[in-house]
Regions:
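ATP-dependent carboxylate-amine ligase catalytic core
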Residues: 2-120, 128-155, 164-168
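Residues that mark the start of a beta-strand
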Residues: 7, 35-36, 254-256, 282
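Beta-strand->loop->alpha-helix junctions that form or flank phosphate-binding loops
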Residues: 41-42, 180-190, 282-289
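A short helix->loop->beta-strand "cap" motif at the edges of active sites that frequently abuts
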Residues: 122, 180, 329-333
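Internal gly/pro-rich beta-alpha loop/helix module
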Residues: 134-249
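Glycine-rich phosphate/diphosphate-binding loop of Rossmann-like nucleotide-binding domains
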Residues: 255, 259-292
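Helical hairpin unit composed of two closely spaced alpha helices linked by a short loop
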Residues: 292, 297-300, 343
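Cysteine-nucleophile active-site neighborhood
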Residues: 307-345
Length: 345
């Protein structure tokens, strides 16, 4: 079957160029205009995905070819993007890339953002850090275009622009060398008003002003980026071919699986929780920083996170820790990973 999914990939030349800032701002700004936005993050990253979830108001899905395979990645985009209800403001899937456009696990570029964009036949918008450069920006953009002509490179967003002359010089160079539209220019001063350093480094739940940061980011992006042009580019993406999703029979609820989800343990992929429910589990969410005791459950899932930053809060619940230890010693099945494994250990 073929599915229509308006979509675009926001990519960069490297880490720290402003991809997450732009992606979070675009997602929230479009949402505030009435557009139905479904966010995706290339790769396994939890933190960027959490900020995108906060911006969109719905879970962000990770698209990782290495972990899930190409077919599952396409299926995820179709399952969560093609079913978007029609709205007056339209609908769009926004996919944030990772690292540089062509950076991957090996020298072939497989698993790169470029590989993902080709797999999904998605237009690519390149965000470029313009700090202390002018015409060189155009040469870097041209290099990306020439490295892989199969890419649907559709435009550029300039980040950290110093002044009007700086912007004009770069726009002129890109027009001369690249024949690509500049879709926006984010001033260095405007971006500095938002704690950009936290985006991608700190989970929203640990950020004292997460909502204010997302709102401020959206305001900057809405003022300096052509959102209508982004939607038009996303709408040019061709339909995607994918098999019909298999029907999953409803499984009777047969067990209670505790999931420790709080400020210390927050690294969960929604697909894993959905898979547990599909197999008949009733999920019981637990907060190790607030609950006095572990509730009655048949199994326990403790995901990753940053328990070291919440050590005081975890230590303030000795009764919870004792009840967990007693349950484990009594044979409770526990699956723990990353920070969860550290806590249990």
């Amino acid at each position: 079957m073929r599915f229509d999914v308006p979509r675009l990939v926001l990519a960069g030349l490297g880490g720290g160029c402003g991809k997450t800032f732009l992606a979070v701002g675009v997602v929230r700004a479009l949402r505030e205009r009435g557009t139905r936005v479904v966010p995706f993050k290339k790769g396994p990253d939890y933190i960027d995905a959490a900020w995108l979830s906060r911006a969109a108001g719905i879970p962000c899905r990770n698209l990782d070819v290495h972990l899930a395979g190409e077919a599952a990645v396409v299926r995820s985009l179709v399952d969560h993007g093609a079913g978007m209800p029609k709205r007056a403001g339209g609908s769009v899937a926004v996919i944030e890339g990772a690292r540089g456009l062509f950076d991957a696990m090996d020298e072939t570029g497989k698993t790169s953002t470029a590989h993902l964009a080709r797999l999904l036949s998605s237009p690519v918008v390149l965000v470029v850090d313009c700090t202390k450069v002018t015409r060189t920006v155009a040469s870097m953009v041209l290099g990306c275009r020439m490295t892989d002509r199969r890419l649907r490179l559709a435009g550029v967003v300039l980040n950290r622009i110093g002044n009007a002359r700086h912007e004009a010089n770069i726009r002129s160079a890109i027009a001369d060398l690249c024949d690509l539209p500049v879709l926006g220019a984010l001033p260095r001063a405007a971006a500095a008003a938002v704690p950009e350093r936290h985006l991608g480094l700190v989970m929203p739940d640990e950020h004292a002003a997460a909502e204010e940061s997302v709102a401020a980011t959206a305001e900057v992006v809405a003022r300096h980026v052509d959102l209508d042009a982004l939607l038009e580019i996303a709408g040019r993406a061709p339909s995607l071919s994918a098999p019909r999703a298999p029907r999953t029979p409803r499984t009777p609820r047969t067990c209670r699986v505790g999931v420790v989800r709080d400020s210390a343990f927050s690294f969960y992929y929604p697909e894993n929780l959905e898979a547990l429910e599909a197999e008949g589990a009733t999920l019981v969410f637990v907060d190790a920083t607030r609950d006095e005791l572990l509730p009655e459950v048949d199994a326990l899932y403790i995901g990753g996170g940053f328990p070291e930053t919440q050590a005081d809060r975890l230590a303030s619940r000795p009764g919870f820790a004792r009840s967990l230890r007693a349950a484990v010693e009594d044979g409770l099945p526990v699956y723990a990973e990353c920070g969860g494994a550290v806590y249990v250990g």
